[in-house]
Protein backbone atom coordinates (compact mmCIF):
# COMPACT_ATOMS: atom_id res chain seq x y z
CA UNK A 1 0.00 0.00 0.00
CA UNK A 2 2.85 2.36 0.87
CA UNK A 3 4.47 1.66 -2.48
CA UNK A 4 1.26 2.49 -4.30
CA UNK A 5 0.89 5.72 -2.34
CA UNK A 6 4.50 6.69 -3.10
CA UNK A 7 3.94 5.97 -6.77
CA UNK A 8 0.86 8.20 -6.77
CA UNK A 9 2.80 11.02 -5.08
CA UNK A 10 5.63 10.76 -7.57
CA UNK A 11 3.22 10.66 -10.49
CA UNK A 12 1.29 13.65 -9.15
CA UNK A 13 4.49 15.61 -8.57
CA UNK A 14 5.71 14.90 -12.09
CA UNK A 15 2.34 15.89 -13.52
CA UNK A 16 2.27 19.13 -11.52
CA UNK A 17 5.83 19.86 -12.53
CA UNK A 18 4.94 19.47 -16.18
CA UNK A 19 1.86 21.70 -15.70
CA UNK A 20 3.91 24.37 -13.90
CA UNK A 21 6.51 24.22 -16.65
CA UNK A 22 3.76 24.52 -19.24
CA UNK A 23 2.29 27.51 -17.38
CA UNK A 24 5.70 29.17 -17.26
CA UNK A 25 6.15 28.52 -20.98
CA UNK A 26 2.69 29.95 -21.58
CA UNK A 27 3.48 33.06 -19.52
CA UNK A 28 6.71 33.59 -21.45
CA UNK A 29 4.85 33.15 -24.72
CA UNK A 30 2.27 35.68 -23.60
CA UNK A 31 5.03 38.18 -22.74
CA UNK A 32 6.64 37.58 -26.13
CA UNK A 33 3.31 38.07 -27.90
CA UNK A 34 2.57 41.24 -25.92
CA UNK A 35 5.97 42.63 -26.90
CA UNK A 36 5.25 41.81 -30.54
CA UNK A 37 1.83 43.50 -30.27
CA UNK A 38 3.42 46.65 -28.81
CA UNK A 39 6.00 46.65 -31.59
CA UNK A 40 3.28 46.23 -34.21
CA UNK A 41 1.21 49.01 -32.63
CA UNK A 42 4.23 51.32 -32.78
CA UNK A 43 4.83 50.43 -36.42
CA UNK A 44 1.14 50.96 -37.25
CA UNK A 45 1.22 54.41 -35.65
CA UNK A 46 4.37 55.26 -37.63
CA UNK A 47 2.70 54.08 -40.82
CA UNK A 48 -0.41 56.10 -40.01
CA UNK A 49 1.73 59.24 -39.69
CA UNK A 50 3.42 58.46 -43.02
CA UNK A 51 0.06 57.77 -44.68
CA UNK A 52 -1.31 61.08 -43.40
CA UNK A 53 1.73 62.90 -44.77
CA UNK A 54 1.40 61.13 -48.11
CA UNK A 55 -2.30 61.94 -48.30
CA UNK A 56 -1.60 65.61 -47.66
CA UNK A 57 1.19 65.60 -50.24
CA UNK A 58 -1.14 63.77 -52.61
CA UNK A 59 -3.52 66.72 -52.39
CA UNK A 60 -0.79 68.91 -53.76
CA UNK A 61 -1.03 69.48 -57.46
CA UNK A 62 2.04 71.65 -57.48
CA UNK A 63 4.57 71.67 -60.30
CA UNK A 64 7.65 73.85 -59.88
CA UNK A 65 7.86 74.24 -63.65
CA UNK A 66 4.85 76.52 -63.71
CA UNK A 67 1.95 74.39 -64.85
CA UNK A 68 -1.45 76.04 -64.49
CA UNK A 69 -2.53 73.38 -61.96
CA UNK A 70 -0.21 74.69 -59.25
CA UNK A 71 -2.72 75.53 -56.53
CA UNK A 72 -2.85 73.12 -53.62
CA UNK A 73 -6.38 71.76 -53.82
CA UNK A 74 -8.00 71.36 -50.40
CA UNK A 75 -11.29 70.34 -51.96
CA UNK A 76 -14.50 71.78 -50.56
CA UNK A 77 -13.58 71.33 -46.91
CA UNK A 78 -14.05 75.01 -46.02
CA UNK A 79 -13.09 78.51 -47.13
CA UNK A 80 -10.05 80.05 -45.49
CA UNK A 81 -9.69 83.77 -44.77
CA UNK A 82 -5.89 83.67 -44.92
CA UNK A 83 -2.88 81.34 -44.75
CA UNK A 84 -2.83 81.27 -40.96
CA UNK A 85 -6.17 79.44 -40.96
CA UNK A 86 -4.85 76.92 -43.50
CA UNK A 87 -1.74 76.30 -41.37
CA UNK A 88 -3.76 75.77 -38.21
CA UNK A 89 -6.04 73.35 -40.05
CA UNK A 90 -3.07 71.03 -40.47
CA UNK A 91 -1.59 72.00 -43.84
CA UNK A 92 2.09 72.69 -43.21
CA UNK A 93 3.37 72.63 -46.79
CA UNK A 94 4.32 75.97 -48.36
CA UNK A 95 2.72 76.64 -51.73
CA UNK A 96 -0.17 78.32 -53.52
CA UNK A 97 -3.60 77.98 -51.92
CA UNK A 98 -7.02 79.52 -52.47
CA UNK A 99 -8.25 81.95 -49.81
CA UNK A 100 -11.33 84.13 -49.42
CA UNK A 101 -11.13 86.98 -46.91
CA UNK A 102 -14.40 87.79 -45.15
CA UNK A 103 -15.33 90.79 -47.32
CA UNK A 104 -13.92 89.48 -50.58
CA UNK A 105 -16.56 88.63 -53.22
CA UNK A 106 -14.45 85.78 -54.57
CA UNK A 107 -11.56 83.52 -53.63
CA UNK A 108 -8.09 84.03 -55.09
CA UNK A 109 -4.71 82.31 -55.19
CA UNK A 110 -1.91 83.30 -52.85
CA UNK A 111 1.42 81.82 -51.79
CA UNK A 112 1.39 80.59 -48.19
CA UNK A 113 4.76 80.54 -46.44
CA UNK A 114 4.45 77.76 -43.87
CA UNK A 115 8.04 78.23 -42.62
CA UNK A 116 9.20 80.95 -40.21
CA UNK A 117 6.54 79.94 -37.69
CA UNK A 118 3.97 79.22 -40.40
CA UNK A 119 0.77 80.85 -41.58
CA UNK A 120 2.22 83.76 -43.61
CA UNK A 121 0.19 85.16 -46.52
CA UNK A 122 2.68 86.45 -49.12
CA UNK A 123 1.44 89.72 -50.62
CA UNK A 124 4.48 90.58 -52.75
CA UNK A 125 7.63 88.88 -54.01
CA UNK A 126 10.67 90.05 -55.98
CA UNK A 127 13.24 87.46 -56.97
CA UNK A 128 14.71 87.82 -60.45
CA UNK A 129 13.27 90.79 -62.35
CA UNK A 130 11.08 88.57 -64.53
CA UNK A 131 7.93 90.61 -63.88
CA UNK A 132 7.23 94.20 -64.94
CA UNK A 133 6.23 96.31 -61.91
CA UNK A 134 5.88 99.55 -63.88
CA UNK A 135 2.11 99.19 -64.22
CA UNK A 136 -1.02 101.28 -64.02
CA UNK A 137 -3.67 101.68 -61.35
CA UNK A 138 -5.94 98.81 -62.42
CA UNK A 139 -3.12 96.27 -62.49
CA UNK A 140 -2.00 97.21 -59.00
CA UNK A 141 -5.60 97.25 -57.82
CA UNK A 142 -6.41 93.77 -59.10
CA UNK A 143 -2.99 92.17 -58.74
CA UNK A 144 -0.57 90.78 -61.30
CA UNK A 145 2.39 88.47 -61.75
CA UNK A 146 3.40 84.84 -61.56
CA UNK A 147 0.99 82.92 -59.33
CA UNK A 148 2.22 79.48 -60.36
CA UNK A 149 5.94 79.21 -59.61
CA UNK A 150 7.36 78.93 -56.13
CA UNK A 151 9.64 81.97 -56.50
CA UNK A 152 7.51 83.82 -59.04
CA UNK A 153 7.24 87.60 -58.72
CA UNK A 154 3.82 89.09 -58.03
CA UNK A 155 1.71 91.79 -56.40
CA UNK A 156 -1.39 90.38 -54.71
CA UNK A 157 -3.55 93.41 -55.51
CA UNK A 158 -4.60 96.44 -53.47
CA UNK A 159 -8.22 95.28 -53.31
CA UNK A 160 -7.11 91.96 -51.85
CA UNK A 161 -4.77 93.70 -49.40
CA UNK A 162 -7.71 95.77 -48.19
CA UNK A 163 -9.97 92.71 -47.83
CA UNK A 164 -7.26 90.88 -45.90
CA UNK A 165 -6.21 93.64 -43.52
CA UNK A 166 -9.71 94.78 -42.55
CA UNK A 167 -10.75 91.41 -41.11
CA UNK A 168 -8.32 91.64 -38.18
CA UNK A 169 -5.01 93.20 -37.08
CA UNK A 170 -2.05 91.95 -39.09
CA UNK A 171 1.73 91.96 -38.75
CA UNK A 172 3.71 92.74 -41.90
CA UNK A 173 7.10 91.06 -42.20
CA UNK A 174 9.47 92.03 -45.00
CA UNK A 175 12.32 89.63 -45.79
CA UNK A 176 15.17 91.29 -47.69
CA UNK A 177 18.32 89.85 -49.29
CA UNK A 178 21.21 91.44 -51.17
CA UNK A 179 23.61 90.12 -53.80
CA UNK A 180 26.32 89.46 -51.20
CA UNK A 181 24.24 86.72 -49.53
CA UNK A 182 23.22 88.89 -46.60
CA UNK A 183 19.67 89.09 -45.32
CA UNK A 184 17.68 91.42 -43.08
CA UNK A 185 14.06 91.82 -42.10
CA UNK A 186 11.66 94.55 -41.05
CA UNK A 187 8.44 93.89 -39.17
CA UNK A 188 5.46 96.17 -38.51
CA UNK A 189 2.48 95.63 -36.26
CA UNK A 190 -1.02 96.64 -37.35
CA UNK A 191 -0.40 96.73 -41.09
CA UNK A 192 -3.52 97.95 -42.86
CA UNK A 193 -4.45 99.03 -46.39
CA UNK A 194 -7.43 101.34 -46.89
CA UNK A 195 -10.19 101.01 -49.46
CA UNK A 196 -10.44 102.39 -52.98
CA UNK A 197 -12.12 105.61 -51.80
CA UNK A 198 -9.03 106.32 -49.70
CA UNK A 199 -6.71 105.27 -52.53
CA UNK A 200 -5.52 102.20 -50.60
CA UNK A 201 -3.82 104.28 -47.93
CA UNK A 202 -1.03 102.60 -45.94
CA UNK A 203 -1.07 102.35 -42.15
CA UNK A 204 1.67 100.70 -40.10
CA UNK A 205 2.38 100.35 -36.39
CA UNK A 206 5.38 99.51 -34.24
CA UNK A 207 8.61 98.52 -36.01
CA UNK A 208 11.04 95.75 -35.08
CA UNK A 209 13.78 94.03 -37.05
CA UNK A 210 17.31 94.25 -38.42
CA UNK A 211 16.87 96.22 -41.67
CA UNK A 212 15.99 99.59 -40.15
CA UNK A 213 12.69 101.46 -40.21
CA UNK A 214 12.49 102.73 -43.77
CA UNK A 215 8.70 102.63 -44.08
CA UNK A 216 8.10 105.10 -41.25
CA UNK A 217 11.20 107.17 -42.11
CA UNK A 218 12.36 107.18 -38.51
CA UNK A 219 16.04 107.06 -39.38
CA UNK A 220 16.33 110.89 -39.17
CA UNK A 221 13.77 113.37 -37.77
CA UNK A 222 14.62 116.04 -40.35
CA UNK A 223 13.66 113.84 -43.30
CA UNK A 224 10.68 112.01 -41.83
CA UNK A 225 8.21 114.57 -43.19
CA UNK A 226 9.05 113.62 -46.77
CA UNK A 227 10.52 110.11 -46.35
CA UNK A 228 7.79 108.45 -44.28
CA UNK A 229 5.29 106.20 -46.05
CA UNK A 230 2.88 106.18 -43.11
CA UNK A 231 -0.65 107.21 -44.18
CA UNK A 232 0.50 107.66 -47.78
CA UNK A 233 -1.96 106.91 -50.56
CA UNK A 234 -1.00 104.47 -53.30
CA UNK A 235 0.28 105.97 -56.56
CA UNK A 236 0.89 104.66 -60.07
CA UNK A 237 2.06 106.43 -63.20
CA UNK A 238 -1.57 107.07 -64.21
CA UNK A 239 -2.94 107.88 -60.70
CA UNK A 240 -0.70 110.32 -58.82
CA UNK A 241 -1.49 110.69 -55.10
CA UNK A 242 1.95 111.54 -53.70
CA UNK A 243 3.14 114.75 -51.98
CA UNK A 244 5.63 115.60 -54.71
CA UNK A 245 5.13 118.31 -57.32
CA UNK A 246 6.10 115.77 -59.95
CA UNK A 247 4.98 112.15 -60.30
CA UNK A 248 7.03 109.76 -58.15
CA UNK A 249 5.48 106.64 -59.66
CA UNK A 250 6.28 107.77 -63.18
CA UNK A 251 9.85 108.79 -62.32
CA UNK A 252 10.57 105.69 -60.25
CA UNK A 253 8.73 103.36 -62.65
CA UNK A 254 6.60 101.54 -60.10
CA UNK A 255 3.46 101.67 -58.01
CA UNK A 256 3.95 102.38 -54.30
CA UNK A 257 2.89 104.44 -51.29
CA UNK A 258 5.06 107.37 -52.33
CA UNK A 259 5.60 110.52 -50.30
CA UNK A 260 8.25 112.88 -51.79
CA UNK A 261 9.30 110.28 -53.02
CA UNK A 262 10.55 107.39 -50.83
CA UNK A 263 12.93 105.82 -48.35
CA UNK A 264 11.62 102.40 -49.34
CA UNK A 265 10.37 101.20 -52.70
CA UNK A 266 10.09 97.43 -52.98
CA UNK A 267 8.33 97.55 -56.35
CA UNK A 268 11.18 99.37 -58.08
CA UNK A 269 13.22 98.41 -61.13
CA UNK A 270 15.25 95.20 -60.74
CA UNK A 271 19.00 95.93 -60.86
CA UNK A 272 21.90 93.75 -59.73
CA UNK A 273 23.04 95.59 -56.62
CA UNK A 274 24.67 99.02 -57.06
CA UNK A 275 23.16 100.96 -59.96
CA UNK A 276 23.06 104.35 -61.64
CA UNK A 277 19.90 105.90 -63.05
CA UNK A 278 18.16 109.26 -63.43
CA UNK A 279 16.30 108.60 -60.17
CA UNK A 280 16.71 106.18 -57.27
CA UNK A 281 14.25 103.80 -58.91
CA UNK A 282 15.71 100.45 -57.83
CA UNK A 283 14.36 98.02 -55.23
CA UNK A 284 15.31 100.24 -52.31
CA UNK A 285 15.40 99.90 -48.54
CA UNK A 286 17.32 103.02 -47.55
CA UNK A 287 18.17 102.09 -43.96
CA UNK A 288 20.05 99.01 -45.09
CA UNK A 289 21.72 99.76 -48.43
CA UNK A 290 20.77 103.35 -49.21
CA UNK A 291 19.08 104.67 -52.35
CA UNK A 292 21.57 103.43 -54.92
CA UNK A 293 21.61 99.72 -54.21
CA UNK A 294 18.87 97.49 -55.60
CA UNK A 295 18.10 94.40 -53.55
CA UNK A 296 18.22 90.84 -54.88
CA UNK A 297 15.02 89.55 -53.31
CA UNK A 298 12.05 90.73 -51.30
CA UNK A 299 9.14 88.92 -49.69
CA UNK A 300 6.32 90.90 -48.09
CA UNK A 301 4.09 88.66 -45.99
CA UNK A 302 1.39 89.13 -43.36
CA UNK A 303 -0.02 87.16 -40.45
CA UNK A 304 -2.49 88.04 -37.66
CA UNK A 305 -0.91 89.83 -34.70
CA UNK A 306 -2.33 87.26 -32.29
CA UNK A 307 -1.46 84.19 -34.37
CA UNK A 308 -0.82 81.08 -32.26
CA UNK A 309 0.44 78.11 -34.31
CA UNK A 310 -1.38 74.82 -33.98
CA UNK A 311 1.44 72.30 -33.51
CA UNK A 312 -0.76 69.23 -34.02
UniProtKB/Swiss-Prot annotation:
Under normal conditions, liver-specific. One of its GO terms (cellular component) is collagen-containing extracellular matrix. GO terms for biological process: adaptive immune response; blood coagulation; hepatocyte proliferation; negative regulation of T cell activation; regulation of immune response. It is found in: Secreted. Gene3D superfamilies: Gamma Fibrinogen, chain A, domain 1. PROSITE patterns: FIBRINOGEN_C_1, FIBRINOGEN_C_2. Induction: Expression is induced by interleukin-6 (IL6). Up-regulated in a number of cancers, such as lung cancer, prostate cancer, melanoma and colorectal cancer. The keyword Methyltransferase does not apply. Residues 1-22 form the signal peptide. It comes from the Eukaryota. Its main location: secreted. Disulfide bonds join 83-112, 248-261. Residues 23-61 form a coiled coil. Residues 74-306 form the Fibrinogen C-terminal domain. Homodimer. Interacts (via the Fibrinogen C-terminal domain) with LAG3 (via Ig-like domains 1 and 2). Immune suppressive molecule that inhibits antigen-specific T-cell activation by acting as a major ligand of LAG3. Responsible for LAG3 T-cell inhibitory function. Binds LAG3 independently from MHC class II (MHC-II). Secreted by, and promotes growth of, hepatocytes. This is Fibrinogen-like protein 1. The gene is FGL1.
Amino acid sequence: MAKVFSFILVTTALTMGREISALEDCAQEQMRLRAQVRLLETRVKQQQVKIKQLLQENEVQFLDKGDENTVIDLGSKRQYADCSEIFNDGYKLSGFYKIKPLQSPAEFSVYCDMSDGGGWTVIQRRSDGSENFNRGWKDYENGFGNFVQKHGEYWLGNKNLHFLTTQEDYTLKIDLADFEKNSRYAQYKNFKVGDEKNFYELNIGEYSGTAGDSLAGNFHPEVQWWASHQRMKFSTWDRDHDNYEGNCAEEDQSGWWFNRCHSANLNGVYYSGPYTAKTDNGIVWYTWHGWWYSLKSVVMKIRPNDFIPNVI
